[in-house]
């Protein structure tokens, strides 16, 4: 290990808080550290929001450290109240197990789990069979309710009501860290900055029970300039699963981020050298679009592979140039019979998720924000038939400047 990975993560913009900064940096500089990041299995795919922590894991592994990807088969049964205004709906064990399996398959694309270079663990293995009384005696005794109630993750829920069910989450996550410490020698937990209180709980538990050093690091959360979490679109989350968010849509999301976020995302979400990150981030005016293209290409390449990244880039450039419609764009296919009768534009927009509702679609159409084959359409009742197809045998629907969708007949 040459350059200390702590300095690398700091320079690239990852690190927000550290429990023991100097000690953590010293530890990472002198030995191979086993660390963990938890993933609660709340969906069947990782999202763009997860990708920042996945990148951190990749950096750490490349520097010679050993990641543990902890799947939350147990904690997902409770649900993390952090950042939630209401209690999560309870998920079935079968759904959680399925989601955890999907996460494991996706993480294997980014992390090398061969030859003990990394570990996949599932906290269902130790949480679901816990003896409640023993847990309270062994773990609960180390937690002050007074102190827990001052934690940010609980404070914002107190007005609406926090169930005892959710109140246990911090103890369970702390218990995870302790189990991983005993089982694998895990000394460091990493997570998003919204996990700070939970991570502190685990660090403190190990130091109390084992009289041994344990550490926590949190990363900044990807947010827009308004402070909203990045990785969301009108269609919902930006997924890493290509069947839920196509490589083209994934590429377009990063191609269209705010100018002020380009340098930050290049540092966090690509492996480009920091000199190149700073050069691209300093571009202004129309040149910033080149930096966005590099960003979108590099992230898509990591997530979906070089071939899909090139296809997405080609499709985006084809659209921008006003050229022929590309086979790599998001596409919806209707039967030829449906086009013979005619399909109204509102239905097409709903099916393509270019609108959240019929009224939303109608509003966009009437306000002149929608075009079909580069012709603005303001009649929301207009129906399209096969004789409206362009020379490429398709309808290209655009909403605004950045949302596109192709429609074809079978």
From Swiss-Prot:
> What keywords would UniProt list here?
Aminoacyl-tRNA synthetase, ATP-binding, Cytoplasm, Ligase, Nucleotide-binding, Protein biosynthesis, RNA-binding
Q: Name the family the entry cites.
A: Belongs to the class-I aminoacyl-tRNA synthetase family. TyrS type 1 subfamily.
Give one Pfam family. tRNA-synt_1b
Write out the annotated subcellular location. Cytoplasm
Enumerate the residues binding L-tyrosine: 36, 169, 173
GO biological process annotations for this chain's record? tyrosyl-tRNA aminoacylation
Q: How does it assemble?
A: Homodimer.
Where do we find the motif 'HIGH' region here?
A: 41-50
- Keyword RNA-binding present in the record's keywords: the answer is yes
Indicate what this protein is called per its UniProt record. Tyrosine--tRNA ligase
Q: Which residues form the S4 RNA-binding domain?
A: 343-409
- Domain of life, per UniProt, equals Bacteria
E.C. number(s) listed in UniProt: 6.1.1.1
Q: Which GO terms describe its cellular component?
A: cytosol
The secretion signal range is none
- What is the stated purpose of this protein? Catalyzes the attachment of tyrosine to tRNA(Tyr) in a two-step reaction: tyrosine is first activated by ATP to form Tyr-AMP and then transferred to the acceptor end of tRNA(Tyr).
